């Protein structure tokens, strides 16, 4: 089976046996068709070719592709490009496209239903039922939402820096951006270098860890936004935290986990979504202990 995680930062692919042994991996450029357009399909094809090296593509029985921006598949040109990417890797088997929230959830639990909160460059929460997205909250992009995300943290940091200049926090932000003074920082921000704005998130987290009051205020706001986003979709079932801000050791993760634990909820942490995609492909088969199979996939994947 083949599993693909096609995100806004990178495309990752794995080849795995039906028993959960990962036998091939690949990584290429961004696979989000909204952000990368037709180049996303080429990146997916590159990741697949790398993962399939040394394998016979004809032996692959099926696959699942977890895709950021699945609405792009309403575009016939993008749908055709994804099919061409599959074929370019030598694959002739059927495949299913699911939202990346589905693979992120499945990377944290073998249960079919629950909720997932993702916070990386963007932020979104989704209710999952039988490995399908039922409803979402936020995920609206940097202009309209993504509250508590890496990009949101960066924008909030810039606003704080220009309003508190020349505070120590403003100095941290200016140093990272290379701005020599407040006017240059304003000019830098107005250019909207989105990737570099999101890259300010670690600066905020580091400053919050060091006790900076401005950074701690921003982190507290982010935690509040993210828990509210999750509350909009969470029901019964496990809650999985995904995305770099919630899986790495950040004050955002600590704050969200603490807020949930105060309610008696112990969230799970998402693992590799490309492995989850491969597991989902196998889980579509009619037989087998899915919980045991999930454990096998992630135990094997961790060692591969």
Residue ranges and their predicted role:
Residues 1-59, 107-114, 158-304:
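ATP-binding/phosphotransfer module of carbohydrate and carboxylate kinases, centering on a glycine-rich
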Residues 32-34, 69-70, 139-147, 264-268:
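A short glycine/serine-rich beta->alpha loop
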Residues 6-7, 67-68, 99-101, 119-121, ...:
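Fold-independent oxyanion-binding glycine-rich loops
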